[in-house]
Amino acid sequence: MYSMQLASCVTLTLVLLVNSAPTSSSTSSSTAEAQQQQQQQQQQQQHLEQLLMDLQELLSRMENYRNLKLPRMLTFKFYLPKQATELKDLQCLEDELGPLRHVLDLTQSKSFQLEDAENFISNIRVTVVKLKGSDNTFECQFDDESATVVDFLRRWIAFCQSIISTSPQ
């Protein structure tokens, strides 16, 4: 009688061990998924760094001491999100790229060349879409107070730096 119970127990144990052991296909698929996720994170990091560089370059050109039109540019107001903490908040940046391009068009002069203004805006737009996706259903909640173009760029630079510093390496 005990031998029958022992045989049943051993059989059940073996069945449990066989069914719970990972197979080579499930291990390789989870490894492939992990590698794909790591690649996506690396691409996201690269896109964030590119966006950061473009925004920093725009800001440095605007703050150039020879930019005589900066006081005029500072009269234009931009809107920032109430709290930007996620990539979907880049929709708010995308919404303000049109007005930013118009302000950058004012800077065209002999003393301050921003000859690539159109390219900067285009690059920023493409990078933003890559980061947040093409879905435009997210509605940005803008802050009540507006910001100057310099403050606008500084806040988005800080946003990029924050996301980069908190993303897994």
UniProtKB/Swiss-Prot annotation:
PROSITE patterns assigned to the protein according to its UniProt record, in alphabetical order: INTERLEUKIN_2
Glycosylation-annotated residues: T23
GO CC annotation, single: extracellular space
Subcellular location(s) of the protein: Secreted
Predominant location category: secreted
Gene knockout outcome: Mutant mice exhibit lethal autoimmunity and are impaired in regulatory T-cell production. After 4 to 5 weeks of birth, they develop a thymic disorder resulting in the disruption of thymocyte maturation.
SMART domains cross-referenced by the UniProt entry: IL2 (SM00189)
Disulfide bond sites: C92-C140
One Pfam family per UniProt: IL2
Keywords: Adaptive immunity, Cytokine, Disulfide bond, Glycoprotein, Growth factor, Immunity, Secreted, Signal
Key word Glycoprotein present: yes
Induction note: By bacterial infection.
Signal peptide start-end: 1-20
GO terms for biological process, alphabetical: activated T cell proliferation; adaptive immune response; cell surface receptor signaling pathway via STAT; extrinsic apoptotic signaling pathway in absence of ligand; gene expression; interleukin-2-mediated signaling pathway; leukocyte activation involved in immune response; lymphocyte proliferation
GO molecular function annotation: cytokine activity; growth factor activity; interleukin-2 receptor binding
Tissues expressing the protein: Produced by immune cells including dendritic cells. In contrast, macrophages do not produce IL2 upon bacterial stimulation.
Entry function: Cytokine produced by activated CD4-positive helper T-cells and to a lesser extend activated CD8-positive T-cells and natural killer (NK) cells that plays pivotal roles in the immune response and tolerance. Binds to a receptor complex composed of either the high-affinity trimeric IL-2R (IL2RA/CD25, IL2RB/CD122 and IL2RG/CD132) or the low-affinity dimeric IL-2R (IL2RB and IL2RG). Interaction with the receptor leads to oligomerization and conformation changes in the IL-2R subunits resulting in downstream signaling starting with phosphorylation of JAK1 and JAK3.
Family per record: Belongs to the IL-2 family.
Protein name in the entry: Interleukin-2
